[in-house]
From Swiss-Prot:
Keywords annotated in UniProt: Cytoplasm, DNA damage, DNA recombination, DNA repair, DNA-binding
Function: The RuvA-RuvB-RuvC complex processes Holliday junction (HJ) DNA during genetic recombination and DNA repair, while the RuvA-RuvB complex plays an important role in the rescue of blocked DNA replication forks via replication fork reversal (RFR). RuvA specifically binds to HJ cruciform DNA, conferring on it an open structure. The RuvB hexamer acts as an ATP-dependent pump, pulling dsDNA into and through the RuvAB complex. HJ branch migration allows RuvC to scan DNA until it finds its consensus sequence, where it cleaves and resolves the cruciform DNA.
Family of the protein in this entry: Belongs to the RuvA family.
InterPro entries assigned: DNA_helicase_Holl-junc_RuvA_I, Hlx-hairpin-Hlx_DNA-bd_motif, NA-bd_OB-fold, RuvA, RuvA_2-like
NCBIfam families: ruvA
One Pfam family in the UniProt entry: RuvA_N
Organism whose genome encodes this protein: Borrelia hermsii (strain HS1 / DAH)
Record has Signal as a keyword: no
GO biological process: DNA recombination; DNA repair
GO cellular component, as recorded: cytoplasm; Holliday junction resolvase complex
Name of the molecule in the record: Holliday junction branch migration complex subunit RuvA
Gene name of this polypeptide: ruvA
Region annotation Domain II: where it falls in the sequence: 64-138
Amino acid sequence: MINKIYGKIIEKRESSIVIVALPFEFEVLVSSFCNAELRLLEDVEILTYLHLREDEIKLFGFLNVSEREVFEELISVDGIGPRAALRMLSGMKYDEFRDAIEREDVKRISTVKGIGNKVAGKIFLKLRGKLVKADELTSSVFKFKDLEQSIVNMGFDRKLVVAAIKEIMLIDEFLMLREVEQEQFLFRETLKRLSG
């Protein structure tokens, strides 16, 4: 899988950008919000998702881990493909999307072309309670985003995982550790709290 591309934007289109990462040029499909943040001839680091099918190969790009995670959750919902997921990310900002999911706002979600009430219901079932607030994404918890995702992948609720990580990060034992030891301690203690 292509996880990330470092390169220079040499072309911007309506729903994609072209990045040169010598010796290759990649066309990367992006949300309208992502596209608006990027500038022509700017050096960028884009997180990616590679979509492979028999008849096509598409590369989707994201500015941050959370946007990619939401995209991956969306495409795991029956009836939503990568292009529909990207339309959803283009249709509303992260906080708007999160709030619509938490409120089960069918009207807001179904404003996206191709998303009806039935598919909106599936999205709510899949994503409700899994998305964190945008201000939490920029907190010190974000430093341990990979650890958080690993624990969520073990079947734990994201909100409970984030809450446990925040609590553990405040205790003296954690604060006295060197940075390289903090992640192991955090992983072990978070699992203890969530399992106990």
